[in-house]
Amino acid sequence: MLAQSWAFSRLAIDDGEIWRFAAANFAHLSWPHFAGNLLVFAAAVLLLRAVATPLEIVGVFLLCAIGCTLGLYLGSSLAWYVGASGALCGLLAWGASRLPGAIGPGLLALLTINVAMDQSRTLSWLGEPLAPQGHYWGLACGLALAIISGWRASDAASGWPGAAGAAARSDA
């Protein structure tokens, strides 16, 4: 299941293999690891389908995937990483900011507690090695995207051209 040429490898990235920033999120330790991530992604799509388009969901997932591995590269000493768990944490954090009522804050609280508890774990629920830093960086990226998209939405609603660009400014 693991494609060595896809894994986040600090040494390989230092040698110019920058595709690993994205590809590492699509390589997994095992089929159960892949299936678990795929199930979480499917659940996230079902949860967010009323508040986000499929393009937004995929776009945020991909941004969180790259943001997670960039965070690992720049903000940790982790040498090797595979899996989409970090990107999924980011997608769910971003999605929580869009969910109505208590659902969003509740999801974000549970996600944050889980990521905090992960920081002291070395094995996943599958008994495979865990890189909790990935969950942390994914969560951070998702929260950053939630803040940015929230600002852009509120800018558009107030008439400020933050979301609509220069064209909206010239129309005012």
Model-predicted segments: where are they?
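A detector for small-residue-rich transmembrane helices and their helix-helix packing motifs
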Residues: 1-162, 171-172
